């Protein structure tokens, strides 16, 4: 999708850009594939904030996405390409030969009228889903399962892609967008191609109001707070941190601290850690 830039007619639109949405063919979602979405405002069941900077935003309906791609051997036609407010990628509405409709994440190049399918022996074309053991080495993939039959969990955001590097024993080795090399079972499914809406990362928000529409609240610097609210707070004017290293609001090290568990069970599947 192309990027549309605005003339600086006001401070709000100066430098602002939006996606052109020229790929979108339908503006209203398939009603049978949507459910209501209750907002939490970042609060848990006790009403306490557990994730900061969330709240407000436009009302949304959640689109039910088919991450399992388990209708093997049944062809589907792409009926429409739609916008999904719940994710960065666009979604494609499929209609199968038996009449069932499902949403999938739109890969690059998938358009209305294309035919896609899933199964062990389908063609290697964008949008088709098949087990990793049947995908040639060097192929670009997305929507990758981590456990057989659980549904895709990896490489789902706009513009993301992974590459199948090798196969050995029961596992395939993939290079993920982070640079991590990871082992995935050969029976796990993946979808051929790169996730669409590549231009998403080039969008400039431009003004605070657009972030509020997305449900994002302001991120306040610790140095702008009082000492009671943050370890960086207080002082006269622009005071330094006053500590050996930056801290989180709860007093823990903010930079450089490893947050992954050292003895995590899945560590054995990581061949090479991600690039920093």
Curated annotation (Swiss-Prot):
GO MF annotations in UniProt: rRNA binding; structural constituent of ribosome; transferase activity
Keywords: Ribonucleoprotein, Ribosomal protein, RNA-binding, rRNA-binding
Region spans: Disordered: 218-276
Composition bias type Basic residues, residue spans: 258-276
Pfam family, one: Ribosomal_L2
Gene Ontology CC: large ribosomal subunit
SUPFAM superfamilies with a match to the protein in the record: Nucleic acid-binding proteins (SSF50249), Translation proteins SH3-like domain (SSF50104)
PROSITE patterns listed in its UniProt record: RIBOSOMAL_L2
Keyword rRNA-binding on entry: yes
Superkingdom of the source species: Bacteria
General function of this protein: One of the primary rRNA binding proteins. Required for association of the 30S and 50S subunits to form the 70S ribosome, for tRNA binding and peptide bond formation. It has been suggested to have peptidyltransferase activity; this is somewhat controversial. Makes several contacts with the 16S rRNA in the 70S ribosome.
Family, per entry: Belongs to the universal ribosomal protein uL2 family.
Protein name as catalogued: Large ribosomal subunit protein uL2
The species this protein was found in: Finegoldia magna (strain ATCC 29328 / DSM 20472 / WAL 2508)
Upper classification of the organism: Bacteria, Bacillati, Bacillota, Tissierellia, Tissierellales
Name of the gene this protein is made from: rplB
